[in-house]
């Protein structure tokens, strides 16, 4: 139940998102360096997705995320039988050369019990993949998105780019709407 969709963003749109977000790194209070990678929190759960992505450079990312969600629902309509779920947050991530999130993990845990779906949209072409323990690996390709359940059934890890290039990804979660 992994949805892989190419051409959600053009290479030019990916480059614009990378350049815009990287220029914000030094001025953005949401910038975080956790050693393996840097990330900028583009949207938190208490913020409006539409408002945070209203910037013309980020508008294609907004459209890509909505498109990926709709394509997932089209292919796996049973997700509509769940309680209401919506986007929780979006991060822009940059992995330094030779780094990756290389340990096996899933996104649903006691700290995040409401997570339903995970998504990633690759912004750069790299010679590496997101590996799934029980599913096929997904090669990175600029503009390619993937969406999958956040649960242990979709445990995954990343691998470093063998070409020694920086790697850029938009990622986030859809979670149950808690009232």
Feature locations, PLM:
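Non-heme Fe(II)/2-oxoglutarate
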Residues: 1-84
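Intrinsic-disorder/low-complexity, polar/charged segments enriched in Ser/Thr/Lys/Arg/Asp/Glu/Gln
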Residues: 2-4, 116-118, 169
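Acidic, glycine-rich loop-and-strand cores that form catalytic or ligand-binding grooves
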Residues: 80-96
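Beta-strand elements of modular eukaryotic interaction domains
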Residues: 81, 108-109, 159-160
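Short, conserved beta-strand element in jelly-roll/cupin
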Residues: 92-97, 109-128, 174
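Histidine-centered catalytic micro-motifs
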Residues: 101-109
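Catalytic core of Fe(II)/2-oxoglutarate
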Residues: 104, 115, 125-179
């Amino acid at each position: 139940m992994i949805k892989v969709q190419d051409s959600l963003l053009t290479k030019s749109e990916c480059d614009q998102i990378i350049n815009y977000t990287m220029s914000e790194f030094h001025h953005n209070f949401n910038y975080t360096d956790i050693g393996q990678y840097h990330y900028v929190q583009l949207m938190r759960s208490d913020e409006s997705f539409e408002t945070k992505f209203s910037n013309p450079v980020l508008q294609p990312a907004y459209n890509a995320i909505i498109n990926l969600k709709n394509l997932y629902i089209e292919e796996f309509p049973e997700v509509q039988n769940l309680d209401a779920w919506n986007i929780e947050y979006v991060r822009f991530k940059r992995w330094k050369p030779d780094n990756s999130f290389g340990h096996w993990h899933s996104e649903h845990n006691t700290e995040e019990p409401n997570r339903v779906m995970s998504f990633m949209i690759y912004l750069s072409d790299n010679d590496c993949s997101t590996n799934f323990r029980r599913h096929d690996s997904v090669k990175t390709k600029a503009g390619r998105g993937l969406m999958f359940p956040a649960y242990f059934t979709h445990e995954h890890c990343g691998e470093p780019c063998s070409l020694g290039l920086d790697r850029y990804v938009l990622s986030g979660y859809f979670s149950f709407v808690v009232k």
